[in-house]
C-alpha cells in the first residue's frame, strides 16, 4: 500500500503488487492498482506496518489529536477501510505499531510529549509499559517489534504463552545520534537505523546489540539486506549508492 499523509488525514492506495512471506521464500503477486479511500485526522500521520500486507494491521498515529488507529490489512486488500482499534494516547507525538492482534502504542505519562510505550490488546485493554523518551521510527523483524527511543530501542517479543516481553536495548556509551528511522530486507533480524549523524546504526534484534557504521558522506537512506555479512545498502546526499560490510 501507499499511504499519503497530510494535515487532514491519510489517503490510501493499493499498488497491486505484494508479497507473501513463507520464511524461506516469498510469493509475489500482482493486481490492478486502485485508490482505497481515506482516514480523516489531524496532523501529518505516522504510519507503521507489519510483515504482511494482506494480514495483520497497519498503525496510523495522528499527532494533532493523539489518536492512534489500527487498520485491518485484510479489509484494505478488499478495498475497504476497517478500524479495529482507536484510542486517545494523550500525546502529540508518537506512533502505534501492530503487535500480534493488538499494538505497541506511545503514551505521555505527564504533559503531551510521549515518554513511554504500552502494550494494548485487540480489545483495548492495557498491558505492560516501558519508558521510551522521544519515540521515533519502528520496524517489525522475525524476532519482534522495534521502536526507536532517545536512549536506544524497545524490542517487543511475543512469548509462546501469548504474553509480550518488553526489553530496552540501550546505545553504547558515547554513541552517535539516535536512529529515528529503520529499514531492512523484509523480516530480517538485523536492521539499519538512520539518525542525524553521518553513518548508520545496525541493530541485531537476536543479540540485542547495536553497531555503528560511520560514513564520510551523510546518508539519505540505509537498509540492512542480510544477516551473516552485515551488508548495508545506502544512498548518500551525493546520490551515490554504497554497500557497507559491518565489522566487529
Residue ranges and their predicted role:
Residues 13-25, 71-78, 157-163, 205-207, ...:
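Short loop/turn segments immediately following beta-strands, especially the blade-tip
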Residues 55-110, 123:
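A charged, solvent-exposed segment within the mature domains of Sec-exported extracytoplasmic proteins
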Residues 7-11, 65-69, 102, 110, ...:
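Loop/turn residues immediately N-terminal
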Amino acid at each position: 500500500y501507499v499511504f499519503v499523509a497530510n494535515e487532514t488525514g491519510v489517503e490510501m492506495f493499493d499498488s497491486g503488487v505484494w508479497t507473501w512471506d513463507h520464511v524461506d521464500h516469498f510469493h509475489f503477486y500482482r493486481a490492478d492498482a486502485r485508490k482505497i479511500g481515506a482516514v480523516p485526522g489531524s496532523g501529518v500521520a505516522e504510519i507503521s506496518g507489519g510483515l504482511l500486507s494482506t494480514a495483520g494491521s497497519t498503525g496510523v498515529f495522528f499527532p494533532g489529536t493523539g489518536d492512534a488507529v489500527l487498520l485491518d490489512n485484510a479489509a484494505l486488500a478488499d478495498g475497504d477501510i476497517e478500524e479495529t482499534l482507536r484510542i486517545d494516547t494523550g500525546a502529540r507525538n508518537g506512533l502505534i505499531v501492530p503487535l500480534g492482534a493488538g499494538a505497541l502504542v506511545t503514551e505521555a505519562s505527564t504533559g503531551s510529549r510521549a515518554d513511554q510505550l504500552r502494550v494494548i490488546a485487540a480489545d483495548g485493554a492495557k498491558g505492560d509499559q516501558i519508558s521510551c523518551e522521544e519515540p521515533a521510527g519502528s520496524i517489525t523483524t522475525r524476532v519482534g517489534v522495534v521502536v526507536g527511543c532517545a536512549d536506544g530501542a524497545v524490542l517487543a517479543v511475543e512469548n509462546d504463552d501469548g504474553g509480550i516481553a518488553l526489553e530496552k536495548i540501550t546505545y553504547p556509551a558515547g554513541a552517535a545520534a539516535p536512529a529515528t528511522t529503520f529499514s531492512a530486507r523484509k523480516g530480517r533480524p538485523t536492521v539499519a537505523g538512520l539518525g542525524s549523524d553521518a553513518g548508520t546504526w545496525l541493530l541485531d534484534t537476536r543479540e540485542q546489540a547495536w553497531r555503528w557504521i560511520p560514513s564520510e558522506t551523510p546518508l539519505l537512506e540505509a537498509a540492512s539486506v542480510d544477516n551473516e555479512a552485515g551488508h548495508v545498502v545506502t544512498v548518500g546526499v551525493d546520490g551515490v549508492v554504497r554497500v557497507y560490510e559491518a565489522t566487529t
